[in-house]
C-alpha cells in the first residue's frame, strides 16, 4: 500500500467539513499548504527555527501546531495555550521554505500549489493567518519512489585536539587513504569531513581562529561487504600510528551497515 503524502493529510477533514469539488484548485492548494506547514510537527511552532532562536521559550515543552480551517480556504496556525515554543510569521515562513523545489509549482497528485501567492499575518499571540493561496490542476504524471539495496557502508570518526587540530586531522586522513590504496580496496565512494571546521558549509566557512578540536569523519561505500569491513580495521590504528592528540575511539570499530538507497 502506498503511503499518504504528508502534506495531503489535512485535506480530507477540510473537505469533509467544508465540501468543495475536485477542481476547487485554490481550496485544494490551501489544504496542501496547511499540511506542508504542520507536517514536521513543532518545526513550525518554534523548533529548529533560526530566526531569533535564543528567545523562543520552553522548547522542552514545545506545543505542536494546530490548523483552524475556514470554508473560504484561509486558515490559522496556532498551538495549545500554555505550551512552549512560538507560532509567528517567521516560524511559519521558515517551514514554508522547508524541502522546497519550485515555489510556483508544489506538485501533488491532487493539485499544484503556488507558494508565491501565500500571505501571512499575525492573528494574535501564537496565531498566524494564512491566506491568498492559489492552485491549479494537477499534472498528468505521478511520482514514483523506490527503496532498494545498494551495497554497504561504514563511517569512522576520531577527534583531534588543539594545537593544530585541523592539520592533524588532515594528516590522519592522508595516512588512512594511503593505507586503503596500498590494500587495493576499491570503494564506490569515499567522503572525508572535518566536523567543527567545514563539514556543513565547505569552502564557504569563514576563516576564524584555530579550532580547539576537530572530528575527522570518513565514510565509505561499496557493493562488497568485505571491502567495507577491511576499511573499518584501518581507523583504530591511527590512534597510535598517526598524528598526536587524538581521542574518540572508545566505541570500537565502525559498524558495517547495509545501504538502503532511494530512487530517483
PLM features: what roles do these ranges have?
Residues 28-137, 145-153, 157-159, 168:
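A conserved active-site cap/scaffold subdomain adjacent to cofactor or substrate pockets
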Amino acid at each position: 500500500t502506498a503511503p499518504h503524502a504528508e502534506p495531503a493529510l489535512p485535506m480530507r477533514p477540510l473537505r469533509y467539513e467544508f465540501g468543495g469539488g475536485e477542481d476547487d484548485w485554490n481550496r485544494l492548494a490551501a489544504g496542501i499548504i496547511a499540511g506542508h506547514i504542520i507536517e514536521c510537527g513543532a518545526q513550525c511552532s518554534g523548533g529548529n527555527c533560526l530566526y531569533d532562536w535564543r528567545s523562543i521559550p520552553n522548547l522542552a515543552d514545545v506545543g505542536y501546531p494546530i490548523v483552524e480551517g475556514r470554508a473560504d480556504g484561509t486558515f490559522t496556525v496556532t498551538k495549545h495555550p500554555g505550551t512552549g515554543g512560538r507560532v509567528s510569521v517567521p516560524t511559519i515562513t521558515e517551514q514554508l521554505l522547508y524541502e522546497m523545489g519550485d515555489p510556483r509549482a508544489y506538485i501533488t497528485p491532487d493539485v499544484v500549489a503556488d507558494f508565491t501567492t501565500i500571505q501571512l499575518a499575525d492573528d494574535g499571540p501564537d496565531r498566524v493567518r494564512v491566506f491568498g493561496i492559489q492552485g491549479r490542476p494537477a499534472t498528468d504524471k505521478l511520482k514514483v519512489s523506490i527503496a532498494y539495496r545498494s551495497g554497504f557502508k561504514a563511517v569512522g570518526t576520531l577527534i583531534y585536539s588543539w594545537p593544530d587540530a585541523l592539520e592533524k586531522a588532515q594528516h590522519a586522513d592522508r595516512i588512512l587513504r594511503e593505507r586503503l590504496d596500498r590494500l587495493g580496496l576499491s570503494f564506490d565512494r569515499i567522503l572525508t569531513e572535518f566536523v567543527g571546521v567545514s563539514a556543513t558549509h565547505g569552502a564557504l566557512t569563514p576563516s576564524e581562529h584555530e579550532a580547539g578540536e576537530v572530528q575527522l569523519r570518513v565514510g565509505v561505500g561499496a557493493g562488497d561487504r568485505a571491502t567495507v569491513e577491511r576499511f573499518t580495521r584501518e581507523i583504530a590504528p591511527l590512534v597510535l600510528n598517526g598524528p598526536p592528540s587524538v581521542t574518540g575511539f572508545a566505541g570500537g570499530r565502525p559498524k558495517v551497515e547495509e545501504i538502503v538507497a532511494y530512487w530517483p
